[in-house]
């Protein structure tokens, strides 16, 4: 091969040599990649410069045509590039090398920095054929060197040798800074490589740095040598590895992984007195960095709900052409060919630095949380561990602690499931023990937080404000008795006792209601299907409750209203074991004296044994309680309720005429039933069943199409399939484009259908953003929204949807034609002056024994209706029901007692049932009890 030199040594040089002419097109296509790898300028000379050998001897074929190639740049760079090009065009050896699949991140991660450095060091062409397989070709010496280096990587990876603690810490820190400076979707895979392999990779990156006695961070890799010489002032010459950093620099280098990445980039745009060419993208050790003034880099990520398990991170640069989008990098991840892949990545502006952008610690926090969430860990556990250890800890350390915390949480859940009678609600302690369910993608907050501690504190307060009930209880006070004293005598809380902790939940003085909380009863223990009377509840109401604490060792959880024979033996003990409203606080000495007041000492022993046997599972020592938390959470209660089967049965029977179209906001209903943590399809089925039993047959449920995809936060999706089969479910359009979800606003479908059919929208959303859209929509939002609530699996709607002065529920759900006929019939009846003084007018009630069927009307105030035959055209709308039977009254009384278990309210329940013999509406009767 012919070659001629114009210069020698390390200075600028020029070299010309020949290659086969058929490689011209290949070299032209690889020009950008070669120039970026070796910092040289490549020129393929024109045809007139072609070199041809002398004529061959007779009888031999003529030699192939060759062309001249010219390289300009540093002497060493020119020699390396020449050897690399010769190996590409005329390879002497070609080998395949296998490696473990977990090492794939080395050859494709960190924006191909390690692979490029390996090519620069060995001058062999290395490409990734598939995961676990490399192709190495070039000169014989170059191929052997590359093979040896790859085999060394594999050996270090498989042996997984550890280094000394001090050395290992430095290596991890330097390696983390480097890979985060070239972040991509393989960043986390690189961070968990063995420390010995990390040291070898850093040595590979620093080899050229040592030879050239200086290190230059080059982030472009696309400029020619002439252009690079003009940009001297934009480079930084770093100090030697043995240089020591001052206290100020040590403080500057402390922080989270991303802030350290920022400090590593501080030197990029500062001035330098001199510069020299070295292989591209050489990063020095941390000790060699000189920090001037803080610049910044920005990490951008996608938080779509169905995104890939590994988030892709990148850096942005506004100086480059903005037409190249971030999606291009995700497409190139699927291309394994290094020749076509690397050149594009080197020129991609998404890997450069953007000046003037600040990295928010909130974004760093979200990156860590989202990464561990994709590994299957609960967000609350991840947030808890990061809050304790901080964001600057090694990811592998975080992973180990998260795994330990996850195992501890699973053991607590198993223990809690074995003690279903737990009544102690340790409020606020487990507010973060469940996943958040959000309808929209997570977005980055623009305002950065001051410190990591402030970030965690704010996030904890936000969880508590949403999930925590109104009453605040000190759960760390081990041996105390909280005594509930309601202000009003007619509204007292339920009995709740415990051996070490007794809590009486109620409304706090400063409690405020929010959209995420509904006004309903709070069961203190999971309901038992076979024994409904054993369930204790806290009566709902707005009365203030005062709770005091006293040291005590003895308490009882009473379930039945009647006291035991032993409790009847002494009035003092009866007072002490009675309701919270009559309980008096006593010191331990007073309690001991009361126990000794029994005539027979055996009685005191019997009572003490009964107290201990009443709750054997609550005999937990103080030290043991620190590890096992017996309190129950809303998520656990919801998951327990899913174990009770529910079957949706829509009977094939004609519905009632003159009823409005029911349009259900499926997302709103499902999230409300799932305690705002799950998308509960059972809630949608319960709502549909409620309106079906009322006689409605025109029912439509709108749910976004992406909710039909498999997701752990979506429960019992078979109900959606069942509703879709009968034509009740309608899916609003949504699609995925490049990993991002594009979904239509389902609320618009609700309003459009309500406008066309004159129907009623069942939702708790106020549609505030659509009030100004049109007058028709404003009228729908004002007059045709039906709110609801869930009490467990009971779907409840108000009797007065538009307020106290508005129409009743039955009138609200009737179509316009039937409402006009009803008003005209009432006027005709009133004109005849024939009234009944005792019998109110009711709509027909089918099968009052069903708890989900609702009555049709209710008399209010002093208004009374008439006992008159109805006209022919009114029989379809109205009919007079018979008086409530004794069995129905008993059933309603038992249902109300389940909701209001307090003895004082039972008298009120009996009075209401006696005063309203025609009332079958459980919702209306419950409202009367509360009134």
UniProtKB/Swiss-Prot annotation:
Ranges of Polar residues composition bias in the record: 416-434, 547-557
CDD domains, A to Z: KH-I_N4BP1 (cd22476), KH-I_N4BP1_like_rpt1 (cd09032), PIN_N4BP1-like (cd18728)
Transmembrane segments: none
InterPro entries, alphabetized: KH_N4BP1_1st, KH_N4BP1_2nd, RNase_Zc3h12_NYN, UBA_N4BP1_C, ZC3H12/N4BP1_RNase_Reg
EC number: 3.1.-.-
Keyword annotations of the record: Cytoplasm, Hydrolase, Immunity, Innate immunity, Nuclease, Nucleus, RNA-binding
Chief location bin: cytoplasm
Protein name per Swiss-Prot or TrEMBL: NEDD4-binding protein 1
Organism: Gallus gallus (Chicken)
């Amino acid at each position: 091969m012919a070659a001629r030199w114009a210069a020698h040594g390390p200075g600028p040089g020029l070299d010309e040599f020949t290659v086969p002419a058929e490689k011209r097109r290949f070299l032209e296509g690889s020009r950008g990649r070669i120039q970026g790898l070796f910092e040289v300028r490549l020129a393929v000379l024109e045809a007139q410069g072609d070199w041809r050998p002398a004529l061959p001897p007779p009888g031999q074929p003529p030699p192939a045509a060759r062309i001249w190639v010219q390289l300009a740049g540093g002497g060493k760079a020119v020699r390396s590039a020449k050897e690399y090009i010769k190996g590409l065009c005329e390879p002497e050896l070609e080998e395949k090398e296998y490696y473990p699949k977990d090492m794939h991140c080395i050859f494709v991660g960190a924006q191909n920095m390690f692979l490029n450095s390996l090519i620069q060091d060995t001058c062999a062409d290395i490409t990734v054929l598939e995961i676990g397989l490399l192709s190495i070709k070039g000169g014989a010496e170059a191929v052997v060197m590359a093979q040896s280096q790859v085999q060394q990587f594999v050996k270090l990876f498989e042996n997984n040798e550890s280094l000394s603690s001090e050395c290992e810490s430095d290596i991890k820190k330097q390696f983390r800074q480097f890979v985060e400076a070239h972040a991509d979707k393989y960043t986390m895979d690189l961070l968990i490589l063995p420390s010995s392999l990390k040291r070898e990779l850093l040595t590979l990156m620093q080899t050229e740095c040592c030879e050239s006695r200086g290190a230059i961070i080059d982030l472009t890799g696309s400029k020619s040598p002439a252009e690079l010489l003009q940009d001297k002032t934009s480079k930084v010459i770093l100090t030697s590895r043995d240089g020591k950093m001052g206290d100020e620099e040590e403080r500057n280098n402390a922080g989270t992984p991303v802030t350290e990445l920022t400090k590593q980039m501080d030197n990029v745009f500062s001035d330098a007195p001199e510069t020299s060419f070295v292989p591209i993208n050489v990063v020095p050790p941390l000790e060699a960095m000189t920090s001037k003034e803080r610049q910044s880099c920005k990490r951008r990520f996608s938080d779509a709900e169905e995104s890939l398990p590994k988030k892709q991170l990148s850096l942005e640069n506004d100086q480059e052409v903005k037409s190249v989008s971030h999606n291009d990098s995700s497409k190139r991840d699927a291309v394994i060919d290094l020749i076509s892949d690397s050149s594009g990545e080197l020129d991609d502006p998404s890997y450069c630095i953007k000046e003037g952008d600040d990295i928010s610690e909130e974004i760093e926090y979200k990156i860590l949380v989202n990464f561990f969430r994709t590994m299957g860990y609960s967000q609350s556990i991840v947030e808890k561990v990061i809050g304790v250890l901080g964001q600057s800890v090694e990811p592998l350390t975080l992973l180990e602690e998260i795994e330990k915390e996850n195992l501890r949480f699973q053991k607590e859940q198993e223990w809690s499931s074995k003690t279903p009678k737990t009544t102690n609600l340790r409020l606020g302690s487990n507010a973060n023990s469940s996943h958040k369910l959000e309808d929209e993608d997570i977005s980055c907050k623009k305002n950065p937080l001051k410190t990591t501690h402030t970030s965690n504190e704010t996030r904890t307060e936000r969880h508590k404000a949403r999930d925590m009930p109104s009453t605040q209880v000190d759960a760390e006070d081990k041996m105390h008795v909280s005594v509930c004293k309601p202000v009003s005598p007619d509204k007292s809380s339920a009995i709740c006792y415990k051996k070490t902790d007794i809590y009486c939940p109620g409304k706090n003085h400063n409690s405020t209601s929010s959209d995420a909380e509904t006004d309903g009863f709070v069961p203190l223990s999971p309901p038992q299907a076979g024994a409904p009377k054993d369930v204790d509840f806290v009566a709902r109401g707005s009365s203030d409750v005062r709770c005091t604490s006293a040291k005590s060792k003895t308490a009882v959880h009473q379930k039945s209203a009647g006291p035991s024979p032993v409790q009847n033996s002494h009035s003092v003990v009866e007072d002490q074991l009675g309701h919270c409203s009559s309980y008096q606080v006593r010191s331990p000495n007073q309690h001991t004296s009361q126990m000794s007041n029994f005539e027979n000492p055996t009685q005191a022993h019997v009572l003490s044994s009964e107290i201990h046997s009443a709750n054997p599972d609550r005999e937990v020592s103080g030290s043991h309680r620190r590890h096992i938390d017996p309190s129950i959470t809303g998520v656990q209660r919801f998951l327990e309720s899913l174990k009770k089967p529910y079957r949706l049965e829509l009977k094939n029977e004609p519905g009632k005429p003159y009823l409005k179209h029911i349009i259900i906001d499926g997302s709103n209903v499902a999230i409300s039933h799932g305690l705002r943590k799950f998308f509960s399809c059972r809630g949608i089925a319960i709502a549909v069943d409620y309106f079906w039993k009322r006689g409605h047959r025109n029912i439509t449920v709108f749910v976004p199409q992406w909710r039909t995809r498999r997701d752990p936060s979506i429960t019992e999706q078979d109900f959606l399939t069942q509703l879709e089969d009968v034509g009740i479910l309608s899916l609003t359009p949504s699609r995925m484009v490049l990993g991002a979800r594009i979904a239509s606003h389902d609320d618009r479908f609700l309003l459009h259908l309500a406008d066309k059919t004159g129907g009623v929208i069942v939702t708790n959303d106020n549609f505030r953003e659509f009030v100004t859209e049109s007058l028709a929509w404003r009228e729908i939002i004002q007059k045709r929204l039906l709110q609801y609530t869930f009490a467990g699996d009971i779907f409840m709607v108000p009797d007065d949807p538009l307020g106290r002065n508005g129409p009743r529920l039955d009138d609200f759900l009737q179509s316009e034609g039937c409402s006009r006929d009803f008003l005209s019939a009432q006027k005709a009846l009133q004109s005849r002056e024939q009234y009944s003084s005792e019998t109110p007018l009711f709509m027909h009630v089918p099968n009052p024994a069903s708890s989900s069927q609702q009555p049709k009307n209710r008399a209010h105030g002093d208004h009374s209706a008439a006992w008159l035959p109805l006209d022919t055209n009114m029989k379809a709308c109205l009919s007079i029901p018979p008086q409530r039977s004794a069995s129905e009254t008993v059933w309603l009384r038992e249902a109300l007692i389940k909701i209001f278990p307090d003895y004082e309210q039972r008298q009120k329940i009996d009075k209401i049932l006696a005063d309203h013999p025609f009332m079958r509406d459980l919702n209306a009767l419950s409202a009367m009890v509360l009134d």
